[in-house]
Regions:
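Basic, polyanion-binding surface patches
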Residues: 1-188
């Protein structure tokens, strides 16, 4: 038997991402965002959803670009801390000893400790209610060499210990149990 619950956003898990924004060092900020995802494959597009009252909101709106920095188990404390502290009061890079790096295609910094940094340029902002959705083109992706398979060049997801968010908690991803299309693959 299933129970009826009030409507809610129960789509979990989600990436526990650190989104970076700002066009100069004085305005650089990090915001923890779980409302982040893929919108389109071709052209590659992502979104983040941010409350308008957040410190990063006007910075995002002014510069119209950001970097989605995926996080790891080792970054869990910093990920949570950056979500409960305001950039008005703290330099989050300094406080969490995270290293701002130069992105290739946007002015916003990336986080050097992140295994995967997705550089985005905003196309549209959609006011939805509690959050506004920043719809963006992916203009570059930086992947840490230590997580790339030396033979295939593919990103080794399992070895990166990516962090995810689910219903108020942080979790690391588990083991791979299949791959896309494995259910219809012909047996050899």
């Amino acid at each position: 038997m299933k129970q009826d619950w009030k409507p809610g956003t129960m789509i979990y898990p989600l990436p526990a991402a650190l989104v970076t924004c700002g066009s100069c060092e004085e305005e650089y900020n990090i915001i923890t965002v779980a409302w982040v995802g893929t919108i389109c494959t071709n052209p590659p597009m992502c979104y983040i959803s941010v409350r308008p009252e957040r410190h990063s909101y006007p910075v995002l709106k002014k510069n119209m670009e950001f970097v989605i920095n995926l996080t790891t188990k080792d970054m869990a404390f910093a990920t949570d801390w950056c979500g409960v502290r305001s950039g008005k009061e703290y330099n989050k890079f300094q406080e969490m000893k995270l290293t701002p790096g130069k992105a290739a295609m946007v002015q916003a910094p990336l986080i050097e400790e992140s295994p995967l940094c997705i550089e985005c340029r905003v196309k549209e902002i959609v006011a939805l209610g509690s959050h506004h959705m920043f719809i963006a083109d992916v203009v570059n992706v930086k992947a840490d060499d230590k997580y790339l398979n030396s033979e295939t060049g593919k990103f080794e997801l399992a070895q990166s210990n990516l962090l995810v968010y689910a219903h108020g908690g942080y979790y690391e991803l588990g083991e791979k149990i299949g791959k896309f299309g494995w259910s219809v693959e012909k047996k050899k």
